[in-house]
Amino acid sequence: MTVKEIYGTDFPVILAPMAGITDLPFRILCKEQGADVMVTEMISAKALFYGNKNTLPLMQTEEEEKPIGVQIFGSEPELMGAMAHKIENKGFSYIDINMGCPVPKIVNNKEGSALMLNPELAGRIVKEVSKAVSLPVTVKFRKGFDDDHINAPEFAQIMEENGAAAVAVHGRTRVQYYTGEADWNIIKEVKKAVSIPVIGNGDIFTGEDAVKMREYTGCDGIMVARGAKGNPWLFREIKAALFGEKIPERPTEEEVISMLLRHAQLSVKYKGEKMGIREMRKHTAWYTTGMHGSSSLRNKVNQVETLEALRELLMR
């Protein structure tokens, strides 16, 4: 399959799945600012199987944010296939398999990035999911598990052999988490190793970074993660840079506050007032980084319980 057949565009700029961050409200904002493709937060195949009540909201989508992929994780091939089949008709454009999460409780269950230590099992998972669904199946993984197990190119080949339509590669090992610099060379190596589309991920914080990654690695698209936290405007900057257009001005403080308030309104709309406002505490910290008086503002936001109180606080 071509990049366009999977993602709907020739060089997709994708909002990476980030647990606890890339929920529906945030995805809508990023889409409005130019992100081409969304992915849900990661969803446990086991939780889906057991009907966990906290899992269903993670699959909530809106027409305006599409195309969107659903990301699942697990270590049991048959269960992964069955759960992928169960959710393939929920309006998603593709199924993404998480093989890059570095969090200890995931890794200790032999899930996420732990699968990079077991390429044979990882391949079986991709094979089962690919057999079970008619949607494209993609895989997100890392450079390797640690410096002694840097195997992304070989791992990508196994993914391709077992039916993956595309892969996304984060240029760090599991042991690195998000420290140090992302190794873009490994993305270039993966691109040479497979014939399926390769999405580059890691250290894209500006439009210039996106252009450099495209030119240096030859990747077929980019995935933006931490750079988007508190900064959905990054996508308009990236799109302008990729198209050789004038880079938009950075948002003013007034625009940041306006976006923060819109984010809060969406959060309350989809999660209810209590949960929606509490969710905004972490987002406020990201939106207001470097802003004059941000520390005091964050402390006050942490005490707020209603949308009206938040609005009054932000509009002072």
Tell me what each language-model feature is:
Residues 1-2, 6-10, 14, 19, ...:
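Alpha/beta catalytic cores of nucleotide-metabolism and tRNA/nucleoside-modifying enzymes
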Residues 1-3, 9, 18-93:
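Glycine-rich, positively charged N-terminal anion/phosphate-binding segment
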Residues 13-17, 38-40, 68-72, 95, ...:
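Hydrophobic faces of well-ordered beta-strands that scaffold small-molecule active sites
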Residues 18-20, 43-45, 73-75, 100-102, ...:
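Active-site beta-loop-alpha junctions enriched in small/polar residues
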Residues 29-32, 81-111, 120-196:
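Alpha/beta enzyme core
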Residues 52, 118-119, 231, 272:
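Short, solvent-exposed helix-helix connector turns and helix-capping sites enriched
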Residues 75, 117, 251:
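Residue-level signal for the nucleotide or nucleotide-sugar donor/cofactor binding architecture
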